[in-house]
Structures are given as C-alpha cells and as structure tokens.
Amino acid sequence: MFAISGVDIALWDIVAKNSNLPLCNVLGSAGIKKIPAYASLWRYENKEAVKDRCSSAKNLGYNYIKLHEVFTSEVRAAREALGEEIPVMVDTNCPWTKDEARQILNSWEEFNLYWVEEPINPPEDFESLSNIRSESLIPLAAGENACTSFEFKKMFESEAVDYAQPSVTKVGGITEFNKVVSISQSYGVQVMPHSPYFGPGFL
C-alpha cells in the first residue's frame, strides 16, 4: 500500500502543478487560513521529563498535547503540568489486551482525556475496540495502521472509534483518503489525519 499511496500522491501532485494551484486548493480548501495543530511528544517514561516537555509545548502556544505514554504516573504528571484547560491525548501504540485496556482506561477517566489512541493489539481488532468504547468514558482513536477505505468501513460499522486516523501514505493515497473522509461522515466519526512520517512520507 505504500507504493500505491506514493503513486496516487504523485498523480495528485501532477494535477495540482498542471492547474498551477496548491494541492490544498485543488482538494477544496480555498478560504481556510489556519489549521489547528497539536504537539506530539516522545515517550519519556519519566514524570519530570513529561512535565518539562508539556510545559514547554504549552509555552510555545500549543493548545492540544499528545503523549506517547503507557503508565498512569506519566499521564498524571502531564495533567498536573497542564492543568485542566489543555486537552490531552494519549497514543499508546497498541500495548494491551482488551482486558488490560479496559482496566487501564477505567483508571484514566479522572484525567479527562481527549482520546486514547490504539490501546489494543492487534489494532484491527475492531470488535474488542468497540467493546472497550462502549464501557469507557474516554473517546477512542485509531486507524493509522488501516489500509483502504474498506477497512475503515469495517471499523465504523463496528462502532469502534470516535476519531479515525487515516495515514495518507498507508491508506492508498489521497484518493482513498478522501473516500475515508466521505464514509466517516456517514457514520458520524470525526477524521484526525495521521502524520505520514515514513514510506512515501519521506518524500
């Protein structure tokens, strides 16, 4: 899918250049002046480091901050550093079983998280994600590992997520990404695009 995505992205780039327009305008974003961004931090597994990096991100003007922590102590440290006014997301990178995720998310409800991302392994276990979502007060996000709009449709049909995160370099390129956006609207799921940090994303 990386290769297909790369070819599709290149074709869209050709269309934009032939039109003498930025690709964002070709895709219909004319008039949009600002796009909200969040600070995506490393995994530190150290409370003081988390506090320091969260405070730095806040001072730089970020109004949303994403952690990559899996331990409660670091999530608590982030909330202590940021207060209640800054939304916090946690990307866990598929570390737990369904039962482990259920238990941990239950203990994290006190932190008023914006979402928890990919809490279980394998990430395409949409049935387990749906079960966790139905029992948790914390919204769930997933999708960076999903390929094609067909897989996202299965995700939405399972009611597995609140936020879908297609990666343009994995899902099949811009064409398939747009299909995911269209399908997500039918199911009332919000799209939060994943950053394409490898594969064709290096280009």
Name these PLM-found stretches:
Residues 1-89, 93-102, 106-110:
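N-terminal capping/lid subdomain adjacent to the active-site entrance of alpha/beta enzymes
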Residues 41, 202-203:
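Adenylate-forming
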Residues 67, 72-198, 202:
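Catalytic core of soluble alpha/beta enzymes
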